[in-house]
Structure formats: C-alpha cells, structure tokens
Design a protein with these regions (language model features):
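Low-complexity, glycine/proline-biased repetitive segments and flexible coils/loops
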Residues: 1-153
C-alpha cells in the first residue's frame, strides 16, 4: 500500500517478493522528527509447485505493518499473519496472505500548532482519547491521540 510520502512497491514477479509498503512522511511539528502514515506491505501466497520467498512485503517507514504469508503445505513457523500499522502514527496494515486477514491500520494523530500570542484554550476530549499540550519557540501545540472528539473552549 502507498504511504503519505511515497507509492507502495510492486512485486518482483508472479511468485516473487511481495511489494513493500510506501514510505510515510516525516514531520517535526512536535519538536521531534517523527515519520507518520507508512503503507502496509503486500501479502504473499506460497505455491508449492513453483516455490516463493517465505515472507510478506515489508511495511513502509512510518510504521506500516508487514504483509502476511500463506505458508507451504504442512509447514509451520512462518509469519503467516499480517501485522497491524502502529497506533498513533497512522500506518497502514499489512496485506493478508491467501486465506488470512490483512492487518488493521493504525490509529492516527491530530496535531495543532498556533502562535502563543493567541489566547490559550482549554482542550476537552469526549468519547475516548488523550491530549497533550506544550509550548516552545513562540508556539503552542496540542497533540491528540484517540477515537473521541477534541473540542477547544
């Protein structure tokens, strides 16, 4: 799957390595460089008659999940389940291999920055989540994680 900063990769052949997830996009809005929204890696189906690599596609930078695989008949120990994208960074889930489900996408984040010359507001969260507030370099920043609603009063 594609990410915020780039397209996902193509598989190398019909039975080759599955596509890599697209890279996410880096941002320093919180004061630290963090890469968000990487794409999930492609899933893999193993064909006993042809043979194939034994892994799913790698997730993109920005916490995209790795793809899963349908393993060879009767064999265990392979990463058969796709990996979810990382919570709070918005990464895409990895693709499922054959009969297995794909990974869930990671929850996102809302980041709001404005000049500290504006009046301060109280951030109120309803329905689940948390908000962090900090000031630096003449700005005020709110970082919201969760699945609820953020309102300023």
């Amino acid at each position: 799957g594609g990410g915020a900063g780039g397209l996902g990769g193509d598989k190398t052949s019909n039975f080759g390595e599955p596509g890599k997830g697209g890279d996410g996009r880096s941002s320093s809005i919180t004061g630290s460089s963090i890469t968000y929204a990487g794409g999930g890696g492609g899933g893999q189906f193993y064909d006993d008659s042809v043979g194939a690599v034994l892994s799913g596609g790698v997730g993109g930078t920005g916490c995209g999940g790795d793809g899963g695989i349908m393993p060879p008949s009767g064999q265990v120990g392979f990463n058969r389940y796709a990996v979810a994208g990382t919570a709070g960074l918005g990464g895409g889930g990895g693709g499922g291999g054959a009969y297995f489900a794909g990974g869930n996408g990671g929850s996102g984040v809302v980041i709001i920055t404005f000049p500290d010359t504006f009046p301060d507001a109280q951030a109120v969260v309803t329905g689940g989540g948390r908000v962090f507030k900090f000031s630096a370099g003449g700005t005020r920043t709110y970082v919201f994680y969760g699945d609820g609603t953020l309102e300023f009063q």
